[in-house]
């Protein structure tokens, strides 16, 4: 069965449409650091407004542990959404209580309201299906139909993602549809050469995708904190750099499999090593197999790929027709250790085929480093969801919408 889309819901004029967005943006002291996920939701929300729907937006923000917490309120998000839509957006101070019911009741055709953070209710993320279903039914009372458009949460079995889609006539929004279209191009006969760039802190988070993609890619470039587990698997010492000892044997297996398949796993030849985790820490570029030979010795921290590696990665990326990147190459938040990530990002903007930035920290990195979204083929809104899709895992939030 194919994914159900909004067209399957019929005429939406005057109908209450609950839209599950992923508006989980970085927020500090009420200030939004990156509104990319809000902007990504605009296509679906604008289409529903133009169709005369009464739009009820729901989302989570952060991890408030199932209780109300002002620092995780969606109020600033609702205000920013209104600015981007160029329309008044109402805000309800609760999710399923009196404020939510009154705000939904007051909606006219084409109006929008944002309900308060779903995760102020522990039922949203409960492991108990019955508890989740009860919360979903409370949400369902506020709508006539349901549109799922939070791609970043479709890999989670949560009340607003899974059970709510069963409680009301449901369909996927345009954001989810576009995400799937791009990810399909990465898994179904991708144009070659096909390169995958993986970074980020933990190799354990990427093992599934490495295993699933090895038979499908031409080159796999490894950076970020995870590279040190690969270096250790090759017999090199890595100082005090991030290391997952329990994954070393698994990584050895992947290195052997890649060699058998003729897939290039490209590891850094040089790294930036510092004597502390701060922007003003003393640091230098050293060979990847000589990390403990720096003045910091066994206390040295590898915090970025080196310039030789960054240039080598960029050459491979620019020569590829399909590129998927997930995870920064270093601690890009600290200026001395941002160069590797910036070089890789710039190379992706020069790919003549399909370049995909895989959400999460990668999306935050390219924006923080000054790159406009439209310089890339696609910036995914789902870090974990896109990885699980590429692993070939079943995603409950898609299956409940008819996806197979």
Swiss-Prot record:
Q: Where does substrate bind?
A: 22-24, 37, 60-63, 119, 156
Which pathway does this chain act in? Carbohydrate degradation; glycolysis; pyruvate from D-glyceraldehyde 3-phosphate: step 2/5
Keyword Cytoplasm in annotation: yes
Matching entries from Gene3D superfamilies are given as:
Phosphoglycerate kinase, N-terminal domain (3.40.50.1260)
Catalytic activity entry: (2R)-3-phosphoglycerate + ATP = (2R)-3-phospho-glyceroyl phosphate + ADP
| UniProt xrefs under PROSITE patterns | PGLYCERATE_KINASE
Q: What is its EC number?
A: 2.7.2.3
Which GO terms are recorded in the biological process aspect for this UniProt protein? Answer: gluconeogenesis; glycolytic process
Write out the residues that bind ATP: 206, 302, 333, 359-362
Partners and quaternary state? Monomer.
Question: What are the UniProt keywords, alphabetically?
Answer: ATP-binding, Cytoplasm, Glycolysis, Kinase, Nucleotide-binding, Transferase
The entry sums up its family as follows: Belongs to the phosphoglycerate kinase family.
Give the CC-aspect GO terms.
cytosol
Q: A GO molecular-function term, please?
A: ATP binding
Tell me one Pfam family matched here. PGK
Q: What is its main location?
A: cytoplasm
The protein's name in its UniProt record = Phosphoglycerate kinase
Q: Where in the cell is it found?
A: Cytoplasm
